[in-house]
Amino acid sequence: MLYATGVRIGELVNIKINDINRYDRTIKILGKGRKERVVVYGSYCEEALNVYLKNGRIELNKKKCDYLFLNKDGGRLSDRYIRKIIDDVVVKCELDYHISPHTLRHTFATDMLNNGADLMTVKELLGHSSINTTGIYTHVSNEQLKKVYAFAHPRSKG
C-alpha cells in the first residue's frame, strides 16, 4: 500500500477501516499538519487489501480496533514494525540495496511522473503544500526525455 498510494509511513499506520472507500478505491488520509487529503489505489492494491481483510485482519482484530493494520495483539501496527517487515522482505529477496518506506513513496512519485502524471496531481497525492517539494521527484531518465520529445515535438519525426 505504501507504493500503491505514496502515503507516508505515519499516515499508513493511522488509516482506519472507515477511511477506506472500497467502491471508489480511495482512502482518506490525515497528513502532516493534520491536513486531510484523498489518495487513490489500484486493482493490485485492492486484491491485496481484500486478502488481508478477509483473512489476516479478521484473525488479528481481537480488540475490535478501528485501525486498518493490526499487530499480533490486535492493536495498531507501528511504523517501526512496518520498517522491520520491509527489511525482512529485502533480506528474503536477497536484494543488495536498502529499501525504506520513503523509498517506496519516492518510487511512487517518480513512476507517476515518468508515466505521464502532471506535477500538480502528484503534489496533491503526496500531500505536499509546495510544488517545490514535489519537484525533487522530477529527475527524468533519458529514455523518458526521448519518449516525451518524440510524442510532443512537432519536428521530432524524420
Regions found by a protein language model. Give the residues of each.
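DNA/chromatin major-groove-contacting recognition/catalytic segments
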Residues: 44, 51, 140-158
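Flexible coil/turn residues that form the inter-helical turn or adjacent wing/linker of helix-turn-helix
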Residues: 5, 75, 97, 115
